[in-house]
Amino acid sequence: MAKEFSRTQRVAQEMQKEIAIIIQREVKDPRIGMATVSGVEVSRDLAYAKVFVTFLNDNEPEQVKIAVKALQDASGFIRMMIGKAMRLRVVPELTFSYDNSLVEGMRMSNLVTNVVRNDTERRSVTGEDQED
């Protein structure tokens, strides 16, 4: 019977859960604020992990840089806590990266909404029939 997910994918999923809990409950750095772990990519040899995070108040790029730097500074502590929570021979070295896909998705959604609204207004002004 074939495995649905590789070991690296399973480790990445479990690490995502554990890192989110650790950041929420254990890391007490005020620079981080409300962080969400949106994904984890683990190397094939499980030596390195890239952690993608988003922040609740990510309007200012400077605040995002400060928060990512704070997470990177706390990576040793987070790695130690992962080692206690998960049974791994080697706990991956963590690298934190800001995930702007949520912000980009919202921006694209707003652009589409504006185009549809403008098109509807233009059609109502000119009296054209709506064509789908």
From Swiss-Prot:
It comes from the Bacteria. One of its GO terms (cellular component) is cytosol. GO terms for biological process: maturation of SSU-rRNA. Pfam families: RBFA (PF02033). Disulfide bonds: none annotated. Keywords: Cytoplasm, Ribosome biogenesis. It is found in: Cytoplasm. Belongs to the RbfA family. NCBIfam families: rbfA. This is Ribosome-binding factor A. It comes from Pectobacterium atrosepticum (strain SCRI 1043 / ATCC BAA-672) (Erwinia carotovora subsp. atroseptica).
